[in-house]
Amino acid sequence: MPSDDGTAMALVFSVVKRAAARKRIYAVRARKLGRRAEARLLEALGASEEAQARRLFNNLRGRIDLSENFLATIFDEELAEVLAGYESQLESARATGNSALVSVLTQLRKAEARLSSFYDRQRGRVAVADDEHYFVCPFCGYLATGKAPERCPVCGAAGESIREVAGDF
């Protein structure tokens, strides 16, 4: 879990990222109202805040494992950290009675937990075919293989919203 400094930086990052997204929405609104100068300014403000958020994120990202054991780092440490974060926030949401947040975090935790199934710990490598096709639900992050499901098994999103991850590796 992040240190106190990391937690503070994560909070600032989320505030700046949210502000940038809102500026873009306000820019669209200004454009629809025919207020082009305001729309351009709001786009520029949003771009500035995006740059700020990117810099904060680069600090938050932390050290990247450049060793040959990077898969173990991902599957044994980083996934566990994300799951622990979801669990902690789930407890908090349950304690405050925030059922909407409980639902969202439960879905995200399920999607994240599935990711560990792609790693063969015995062999220390991913357990997928070289030509595997991957599909991600844009709402909960569920990762499907082979073909897109008709409905996301985690959040119920329609299959046509689930997109293939294209990569030319």
Residue ranges of model-derived segments:
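Non-heme di-metal
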Residues: M1-F169
